[in-house]
A protein has these predicted regions:
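Histidine/lysine/aspartate-rich catalytic loop segments that bind and position anionic ligands
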Residues: 114-138
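Conserved N-terminal beta1-alpha1 strand-loop-helix module at the mouth
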Residues: 1-88, 92-99, 103-111, 124-131
Length: 138
């Protein structure tokens, strides 16, 4: 198993976002991790598709989009149109996780599943063979 380096856009300087993305483009990072938060599933709000679209135009690294939102399945096609390589959804946010994973794959992306700290890993038993990545929140 290879260790992947995926810096988060949330650590960037939002006043000079393009410079930080260009720095990541020149780095040895494997991916760029984008945390999308809606203020409902999680208490914070980060950014949405206008920012994702702008980032996708200047970033040369594969995009790993992590949705910390309710109903992430509503944004699969829009995320694929950005050219995202990976779409990460929370187990706790998906009513039909297996269907969501299949839809992500059908849209041409890899599918990641994220677990909140209080969620036992055993909940992934039925779908673990279908996911490309598991992200454990801390």
């Amino acid at each position: 198993m290879k260790t992947m380096i995926s810096p988060s856009l949330l650590s960037a300087n939002f006043i000079d976002l393009k410079s930080d993305i260009e720095m990541i483009n020149k780095s040895e990072a494997d991916w760029l991790h984008l945390d999308v938060m809606d203020g409902v599933f999680v208490p914070n709000i980060s950014f949405g598709f206008p920012v994702l679209e702008a980032v996708s135009k200047v970033c040369t690294k594969p995009l790993d989009v992590h949705f910390m939102i309710q109903h992430p399945e509503n944004y699969i096609e829009q995320t694929a149109k950005l050219g995202a390589m990976m779409m990460n959804v929370h187990y706790e946010a998906c009513t039909h996780l297996h269907r969501t994973i299949q839809q992500i794959h059908a849209a041409g992306m890899k599918a990641g599943v994220t677990l909140n700290p209080s969620t036992p890993v055993c909940v992934l038993e039925d779908i673990i063979c279908d996911v490309d990545m598991v992200l454990l929140m801390s």
